[in-house]
């Protein structure tokens, strides 16, 4: 799953390099969270609740989740973590990790219903374009992959 986070970061950097650099005084404060593995009632659930409060109190402008929001990708976990994320008072965006796609009991359909996209998201924040997509493995504990259709999507969005 670490490869998908790296790809997300490089994708965002690549996309932003195609546009003029903002003036030196322009800033965008991003909170980036990944692999939070929230399960209702576990320690990650409690820690994430604290993190949401800290982010709300911070000066960050946007929150990005890089995948593995849940531990098992169950419908109950996805509903729970979405409820917690919805407490954020900042704009936020999330892409699924392998725990939401490969390990999921719904094969990512619950993620798509709750989060509003099938694993690809493009958005602007300030002068920046962010492109996020799921690059997780298609079986448990395998290496991530960038699919041909993902590259075509990146090119079309950028």
In which residue ranges do the predicted regions lie?
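N-terminal secretory signal peptides that target proteins for export/translocation
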Residues: 1-2
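Generic hydrophobic/packing signal
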Residues: 5, 20, 34, 39, ...
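Bacterial N-terminal signal peptides
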Residues: 5-16
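Preference for short coil/turn "hinge" residues that link or interrupt alpha-helices
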Residues: 6, 29-31, 139
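N-terminal active-site segment of His-dependent metallophosphoesterases
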Residues: 18-80
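Extended active-site neighborhood of metal-dependent phosphoesterases/phosphodiesterases
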Residues: 75-158
């Amino acid at each position: 799953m670490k490869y998908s986070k790296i790809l997300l970061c490089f994708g965002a950097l690549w996309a932003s390099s195609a546009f003029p650099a903002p003036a030196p005084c322009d800033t965008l404060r991003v909170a980036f969270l990944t692999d939070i593995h929230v399960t209702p009632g576990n320690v990650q659930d409690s820690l994430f609740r604290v993190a949401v409060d800290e982010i709300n109190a911070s000066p960050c402008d946007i929150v990005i989740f890089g995948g593995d929001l849940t531990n098992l990708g169950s419908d109950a976990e996805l509903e729970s973590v979405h409820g917690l994320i919805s407490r954020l008072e900042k704009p936020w965006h999330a892409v699924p990790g392998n725990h939401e796609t490969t390990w999921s009991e719904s094969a990512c359909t619950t993620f798509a219903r709750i989060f509003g996209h099938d694993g690809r998201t493009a958005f602007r924040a300030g002068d920046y374009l962010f492109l996020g997509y799921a690059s997780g493995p298609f079986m448990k504990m395998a290496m991530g992959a960038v699919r041909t259709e993902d590259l075509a999507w990146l090119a079309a969005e950028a």
